Amino acid sequence: LVFIEILSLVGGNPGIDCGGFCEFCYFKRVDYKILDNSSIGCRYCPPIQMECDYCYSKIKIVKSGFKPPSEVLKEFQKELFMQELLGFLNFKDLKVNVGSWADILNYPYLNELISYFKELELPVNLGYTSGKSIHNEKIAENIISMGVDEVSFSVFSMDPNKRKRWMNDKTPEESLKALKLFCETIDVNCATVVIPDVIDRADIFRTCSILEDWGIKMFILSRFANFKNQGLILNNKPTIDGKNTHSINDFHELVKDVANEFNFRIIGLPASDPKNDIPFIISRAKYKKYLEELPPINSRATLLTSKLAAPYLKKIFEVIDEDNLVNIINVDKEIADLITHEDITQINLNEVKKKVIVPGGALIRDEQLKKLFNKDGNQRIIIRGPQVLSPFDIYGNMDKEELIRGELKAFRILIERINQ
């Protein structure tokens, strides 16, 4: 059964509402006092305004604490209305993902919220818990008895000592007992953070072997990020001083090895879904035939992208751009949606053509983009590309053909904007 999932965010402050920061938490060294003065904007910001509702909700809401249930339900009903307007609303296929910037089990009105959704007979997924707030099995039993259908659990490691040291879990054995109970009773998605010399290959395989016996649904490996180009845009300090990280290639190879070993769904973040050849399915040689469906390129442009996406895009454009009308420039930032004005200042404008296609989700105001790309006196045309070029379906609701069609649709939009 494929569900349409509606995210219902209850807010919460990372770390503060998690039972303490994990040692590897991205938010651990964010200076919340200066967050309001950050120069991050987005495509939706008005010309004379640095911040709008959209980028506030994405960046600065992390310091706003938990929302009252009335606000959560109001936003949920608004989302239902939008789904109805778009023609997507069908209660039979609807699932609610109750999520938080912190640990969802610390939300003081959780029981009330779950009861509301269950009265509507909706499946409920609790979007994230570290398990640190579970001090005995009764807490897990209560969650199950309320009718929760699915839970996402940050296991980190099956070694209680590692959970205690790196997650600051005061009762790691109880957390793992609760995880076992969840796995035996409802659907469970687990996650770990891959940290060199801490969570290594042997630890991951041991954790996955136990979880397979328990009946896990999905396992997510997140690469530990410790540097600004990896996405630390809200602070200038590493999360853990002196700690190295895996390269993207090494990380993706690790995810592939784990996926080949186990039968449950395994994905990696940043985007890696080995079973579906993600990211950028259509860049692979065995799917080259699909590129024939794309329209021709007939205009010159520079395509700005991220360090991670650039190699895949170059492979695709080598095939579809026969006249070499488009050059691809990447900044050092690994994820396009986290590109900020600082990344643009590092670009050599001599390599930039008259028309520039910028990632749709880049965290820069359009007015800033114009100033930065035209500071050499050239009046360039700045166009936003699609929000996503390679759709990433975390919960596995789309088959490979649907994912390919999603990529082709995004690239048709991209080529249309290149040609306009």
List PLM regions with ranges:
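Active-site beta-loop-alpha junctions enriched in small/polar residues
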Residues: 101-103, 129-133, 156-158, 193-197, ...
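Core AdoMet radical
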Residues: 29-107, 113, 117-135, 143-175
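Conserved strand-turn element in the central/C-terminal portion of the radical SAM core barrel
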Residues: 160, 178-203, 225-226
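Surface-exposed amphipathic alpha-helices with a cationic face
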Residues: 80, 111-121, 144, 179-184, ...
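Flexible, acidic/Gly-rich N-terminal and inter-domain linker regions that tether
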Residues: 1-55, 372-378
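Auxiliary Fe-S-binding modules of radical SAM enzymes
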Residues: 205, 212-420
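Catalytic cores of alpha/beta
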Residues: 137-141, 196-214
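Hydrophobic faces of well-ordered beta-strands that scaffold small-molecule active sites
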Residues: 5-10, 94-100, 124-128, 149-153, ...
